[in-house]
From Swiss-Prot:
A GO BP entry: tRNA wobble guanine modification
Phylogenetic classification of the source organism: Bacteria, Pseudomonadati, Pseudomonadota, Alphaproteobacteria, Hyphomicrobiales
Keywords assigned: Glycosyltransferase, Queuosine biosynthesis, Transferase, tRNA processing
Function of the protein: Catalyzes the base-exchange of a guanine (G) residue with the queuine precursor 7-aminomethyl-7-deazaguanine (PreQ1) at position 34 (anticodon wobble position) in tRNAs with GU(N) anticodons (tRNA-Asp, -Asn, -His and -Tyr). Catalysis occurs through a double-displacement mechanism. The nucleophile active site attacks the C1' of nucleotide 34 to detach the guanine base from the RNA, forming a covalent enzyme-RNA intermediate. The proton acceptor active site deprotonates the incoming PreQ1, allowing a nucleophilic attack on the C1' of the ribose to form the product.
HAMAP family: Q_tRNA_Tgt
Gene Ontology molecular function, alphabetical: tRNA-guanosine(34) queuine transglycosylase activity
Complex formation: Homodimer. Within each dimer, one monomer is responsible for RNA recognition and catalysis, while the other monomer binds to the replacement base PreQ1.
Residues binding substrate: 93-97, 147, 190, 217
Enzyme nomenclature, EC number: 2.4.2.29
One GO CC term on file: cytosol
Enzyme class: transferase
InterPro entries documented for this protein: ArchSynthase1/Queuine_TRR, TGT, TGT-like_sf, tRNA_ribo_trans-like
Record's protein name: Queuine tRNA-ribosyltransferase
Length: 376
């Protein structure tokens, strides 16, 4: 019999939590950052590298995998873990966000959403039941409910309609998910930037007795202050003994401030996307390797980093790779960025354990504020 899904809070510092999610395919140390493996790949990285930087779990995208190569094909080939050679936990999103943002001619009803592929225009249907079916075919460990995410700003009536629909879809997803030993389905709190709707959504989802809860519909155009206000309102309404996942977030600063409000899990394309566009994350803040100031600089990105990409290659070489559009440039900078993000999470976890989270957060923020090393 499969080991049951479990979550345990090991330490707290204020509202920040250090915990562990235990699943048959492995443990997830929280707070955790999940590299995004949209189509079964963390772009420009091979899976041993992703594991090597410290990732316990990656994210796969239901929408993209459904379109290509197809969930049924992945299932025939042994599931996403076997297909991608990643034997550790995988979380799949529901596909709803991409349907809303990428697809043309979509039509939303109580039943679900019909849409055309952004690749070839082929028609598809996505219902709560079909979303869970696809995620189960992929054999993901944590599955997300299908929801409707509204971009901000939006009219209050539209935000409320989408939130209520998402709650009804959560019930249907829960039924479709059933009892899958060792796995979990998370509900998604919606409600836009309205405090009352966020509370209603969080309370209704909590009453469903799910194994985890996500906060969705943030970092979609609103100021950071609004996002943090919604977290201040939402997190206390969610069960303290269940993991909390802030979807699609975010910058290192977003992560620090969200952990301080009780968030346990994060995902974002930012470190991988930035790496493909010449931008490096370091303890001194962001470094744009496209800038000419690096052309003759023999120094590494960060001599104190444990990542070879940051420690062993000169800025001049990285600048050359980026400006020449060499694939190795994207590979090295993505390696650096994911290493930085995982080191940030490691520092956060250690600080919570030693009750020094606020002080360590201030040190990290001060490092960003000091900026990059001076030009030679």
């Amino acid at each position: 019999m499969a080991k049951p899904f479990s979550f345990k809070v090991l330490a707290t510092d204020g509202r920040a939590r250090r915990g562990i999610i235990d699943m048959p395919r492995g443990e997830i140390r929280t707070p955790a950052f999940m590299p995004v493996g949209t189509g079964g790949t963390v772009k420009t990285m091979y899976m041993d590298q992703v594991r090597g930087v410290g990732a316990d779990i990656i994210l796969g995208n239901t929408y993209h995998l459904m379109l290509r190569p197809g969930a049924e094909r992945v299932a025939r080939l042994g599931g996403l873990h076997e297909f991608a050679r990643w034997p550790h936990p995988i979380l799949t999103d529901s596909g709803g966000f991409q349907v809303m943002s990428l697809s043309k001619l979509r039509k939303l009803t109580e039943k679900g959403v019909t849409f055309r592929s952004h690749i070839d225009g082929a028609p598809y249907e996505m219902s709560p039941e079909r979303s869970i079916e696809i995620q189960s075919l992929l054999d993901s460990d944590i599955q997300m409910q299908l929801d409707e995410c509204t971009a901000l700003p939006a009219e209050l009536k539209e935000i409320e309609r989408a939130m209520e629909l998402s709650l009804r879809w959560a019930e249907r997803c829960k039924t479709a998910f059933g009892d899958q030993p060792g796995k979990a389905m998370f509900g998604i709190v919606q409600g836009g930037d309205n405090a009352a709707l966020r509370v209603r959504s969080a309370q209704a989802l909590s009453a469903m007795g799910l194994k985890g809860y996500a906060v969705g519909g943030l970092a979609v155009g609103e100021p950071q202050a609004v996002m943090l206000e919604m977290l201040d309102i939402t997190c206390p309404e969610l069960p303290a003994d269940k993991p909390r996942y802030l979807m699609g977030v975010g910058t290192p600063d977003d992560i620090l401030k969200s952990v301080a409000r009780g968030i346990d899990m994060f995902d974002c394309v930012m470190p991988t996307r930035a790496g493909r566009h010449g931008l490096a994350y370091t303890r001194r803040g962001k470094v744009n390797l496209r800038n000419a100031r690096h052309a003759d600089d023999p120094r590494p990105l960060d001599e104190e980093s444990d990542c070879p990409a940051a420690r062993d290659y000169s800025r001049a070489y990285l600048h050359h790779l980026v400006r020449s559009q060499e694939a190795l440039g994207a590979m090295l900078l993505t390696w650096n960025n994911l290493s930085y993000y995982q080191k940030l999470m490691q520092d956060i976890r250690a600080a919570i354990e030693t009750q020094t989270f606020e002080a360590r957060g201030a040190e990290i923020t001060e490092g960003w504020a000091r900026g990059d090393i001076p030009v030679l």
